[in-house]
Amino acid sequence: MSGGGPLRDRTVVVTGAARGIGAALARDLAGRGARIALLGHERSGLEAVAESLPTRTWAGELDITDDAALERAAEQVRTHLGTPSAVVANAGVAEGGPFVTSDPALWRRVIDVNLTGSAATARAFLPDLLATKGYHLQVASLASIGAAPMMSAYCASKAGVEAFAHSLRAEVAHHGVAVGIGYVNWTDTDMIRDADRHPVLRELRGHMPPPARRLYPADQVAARLADAVEHRSTAVYVPRWLRLAQAARAALPPVVLRVARRELARLEAEDPMRHTGLLGAGGEADRARTRT
């Protein structure tokens, strides 16, 4: 049975909704009574999630970097579900490996999906949020607070979405639109499980403090993000201790540098890191779509 709280019968758009955090978030929001528009690659995955929800849904398969496709999707969402009052920009991809030998097209694709795609999502749906005095939640990452080696495109993109959200918030606040940032730590998704198959990435995560290297269940992360949507939060940290990393962010680069200097030479000598390509089933779906 759907909930009767502030999200009941409100339309919420979730990108990257076919799997992982996006799918879990769609389920949680629908459980609170929201109508859900699911956007992303993998039509079958989007439709499977949509069919599992207890409220009205609409699923749209698209490339999140395609402005025209997003404009068409926004029109379809209004037609089928009503004007959105919340948008969650969650879609993202990642790849790992040394920057010096990285594939320029693949590196650029990570930036395009994570940063440009988030901005394109906001652009397409901002007229709706202005009309409803709604809420835009940008899903960011621990990587927005502190960058790690071997993940340069992902870290750059997540730093970028944080800055974009701060800028957008200041721009639209006087119109009654709220903008929040979701800082998310390692989550148990296919993307992270795929990253752990690569020894250098796995060991670098292993050198983080115990709470920081733990994998958190997608449902737990989604519940906190759904709370943020419900309360129009300016920032949400998943888990809550991540707020401490935010407070200490100026001290993080020297710590990361010290660990990298000590460990990367050893790790690369033992097993030279190869480029991962786009990680996880979501990355494979992105590759398949952009090849066609």
Predicted regions, residues:
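Residue(s) in the substrate-gating loop at a strand-loop-helix junction
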Residues: S141
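SDR active-site lid
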Residues: H174-L242
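Active-site helix of classical SDR
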Residues: A122, S157
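Conserved glycine-rich cofactor-binding loop
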Residues: A18-R19
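The beta1-alpha1 cofactor-binding region of Rossmann-like NAD(H)/NADP(H)-dependent oxidoreductases
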Residues: L62-R72, P104
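Conserved glycine-rich Rossmann-like NAD(P)H-binding loop of the short-chain dehydrogenase/reductase
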Residues: R32-A48
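Substrate-binding pocket helix/loop in short-chain dehydrogenase/reductase
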Residues: P98-F99, D103-I111
